[in-house]
Amino acid sequence: MSFCLTELHLWSLKSTLHIADRDIGVYQYYDKKDLPVSAAEHGNLEEKQRLAESRDYPWTLKNRRPEKLRDSLKELEELMQNSQCVLCQWKSKHICQLLFGSGVLVSLSLSGPQLEKVVIDRSLVGKLISDTISDALLTDSFIILSFLAQNKLCFIQFAKKMDSLDVNKRLEKLSALDYKISYHDIPGPATRTVDRHLAINSTQDLAVCWWPLLSDDAWPWTPIASEKDRANMLLLGFTQGGLEVLSSVRTEWNPLDVHFGTRQPYQVFTVECSFSVDQEPMADSCIYESVRNKLHCVSVTRIPLRSKAISCCKNSTEDKLIVGCEDSSVILYEAHRGVTLLAQAELMPSLISCHPSGAILLVGSNQGELQVFDIALSPINIQLLAEDCLPKETLQFNKFFDFSSSLVHMQWIAPPIVFQKPKRGEICDLLFLRFNRGPLGVLLFKLGVLRRGQLGLVDLIFQYIHCDEVYEAVSVLSSMNWDTLGQQCFISMSTIVNHLLRQRLTPEREAQLEASLGTFYAPARPLLDTTVLAYRDPVGTYARRLFHHLLRYQRFEKAFLLAVDIGARDLFMDIHYLALDMGELALAEVARRRADDIDVESVCSGVELLGPLDRRDMLNEGFAGSALTPEGGNPFPDLLPSSGSTPKHTIQQKIPNGPSNRRAIERKNEVMEETEEEEEEEEEAAACTDSSVATTWDAEGELREDHRRQDTEDVGSLRMVHFGLV
């Protein structure tokens, strides 16, 4: 079984942490001034210390000048006890900045999971109009602050720009940057305590300030409130001297999250908590576009939920939206397929964080629990490094604290695209954790050396195949987009197909093979022509291998339908000779006739007919035609469970209705010109099957029955439900 192996590193010197000496996967810092403990209480503490030092994990912190790391960490822990952290931002993989409500700016320097330097900057303390900061934006050129009680924004501009590549300069204090402070009035409630949030685009020339909607009866001091005052989302621009409000809008529903697009810097993405006509909870994924410094809503996608949304997150490519609900359900909406997946978490999903690679997502609760899902919402077990291998569905952090401390923030340690682009092949295995009133820490994912520390989609599928969890691997492959991840999709598909072709063919594995190849041949949306041209030949090779695999297990009907789509004469001749050996004379005659037809067509055209070039658009007619299954058995189960196991999660997929943009492709050479030939083929097809109902698998792996009447162009009762090879 696949599971995540982790280590927990808490940056704390407090003795209130309850970490046993046998917890070899949990580390903290120890103070030299601590009294020695008895050997009976901590019998293995010395062995754990030797283990930590052998891995270059410091057991005690040094206090040398000028850093004085031990004293700085104690000061940071005291600050977290008395002030609220309003911003946690990773400038790079090694630099983290924390801003507290009192104006204290803390910079952390990391080396792996360990602290190297802590710089506490109090330059802004006492210089602001309020010590109740709501949110902040930190860049190399300026800082923007919003306040809870003041209807103003603070703009702090630096005369000297910090060098993004110089780590030492990044840890310098603000006083060395010669900054200038200015304040700007903004619309909205003036005498109300409101959480005003901030977001900035990747080009750093636009920003938004937003807050939750207020009720209409909250304006007793003004008889009529203007539309500008009723707005809850502001578009901000930068001038020579500071900020200006370019546009203001009022969202239709209460926003849960607002941010700029990473690929579209002038589009604002919002997630709003809405209700349907029947008062059912929903989530609206909206896109606002900035046109001539005005915000306009250009798109709204409504996602049905089981209960009210409390958290949300998007993947790095912004084509998947994950929503956590009050009933512990997790909803994942895939934009490129137009489907919705559902899973039930073992905790309250108050926090959601998606890995930068898009392979896994983490769901956390305020009670200090953590659960891992893959991008298809299959749960992945997790455990801390220990002597025994006992992975569980959730990871509990509260048991390490003698006091009640809730998990309030978690984030993968990776630089945002706003500041620098992630390097290709860069390892991302650290999850930053912040607990209310402390401590801080990281969760280190030990990914191993075979995958070079990577945690991508291909790496996840390799691990699933290694553990023979084919169902989970196929689900991840189905969630991938061939148009944007073509090479990764092909590697993943070939890995799954190769694994299945090495094993004995069963109805379950046959369905898994069809679902894997169906991600290319039967996508939910037609693939781009460039994608089809790039991968049709290598994927077609695996289709031929599947054909011979079907013949090896005497699956003549499926092999015949596959050969029809490939359109190669040698495949029909293989069926012909094998059918003769098995005594299937009717099938042998049909296959021979098909081979002769291909010969005639190739002679007339002057080239060998290799199959239709644009038959991918006909895959909705079905995939692998089980109307030709033997009597007394259905080759497809209701689900696609992995071999020897059943899926532990529930996936609900919904495809919104909409007009199809598939082109209708006429199939040639399917209708015989003479009525006598049609009757002969009807009799021969009847020898292969007597079923008129086709059971097919759609692109999402859901079983469906096709009761559509056969076209008059079909050959007798032999329903041609094809792969649609390109």
Swiss-Prot record:
Any single GO CC term annotated in Swiss-Prot or TrEMBL for this entry: plasma membrane
GO biological process, one term: regulation of protein localization
UniProt key word Transferase: no
Gene Ontology molecular-function annotations: phosphatidylinositol binding
WD repeat positions: 305-343, 344-383
Gene3D superfamilies membership: YVTN repeat-like/Quinoprotein amine dehydrogenase
Record field: compositional bias (Acidic residues): 672-685
Main location: membrane
Residue numbers spanned by region Disordered: 642-717
Keyword terms, alphabetized: Cell membrane, Cell projection, Cilium, Cilium biogenesis/degradation, Cytoplasm, Cytoskeleton, Membrane, Repeat, WD repeat
Keyword set includes Membrane: yes
Localization (cell): Cell membrane; Cytoplasm, Cytoskeleton, Cilium axoneme; Cytoplasm, Cytoskeleton, Cilium basal body
Biased composition range(s): Basic and acidic residues: 701-712
Record field: compositional bias (Polar residues): 642-660
Oligomer and partners: Component of the CPLANE (ciliogenesis and planar polarity effectors) complex, composed of INTU, FUZ and WDPCP. Interacts with CPLANE1.
UniProt record similarity statement: Belongs to the WD repeat fritz family.
Function: Probable effector of the planar cell polarity signaling pathway which regulates the septin cytoskeleton in both ciliogenesis and collective cell movements. Together with FUZ and WDPCP proposed to function as core component of the CPLANE (ciliogenesis and planar polarity effectors) complex involved in the recruitment of peripheral IFT-A proteins to basal bodies. Binds phosphatidylinositol 3-phosphate with highest affinity, followed by phosphatidylinositol 4-phosphate and phosphatidylinositol 5-phosphate.
Name this polypeptide is given: WD repeat-containing and planar cell polarity effector protein fritz homolog
Organism: Rattus norvegicus
Source lineage: Eukaryota, Metazoa, Chordata, Craniata, Vertebrata
Record gene name: Wdpcp
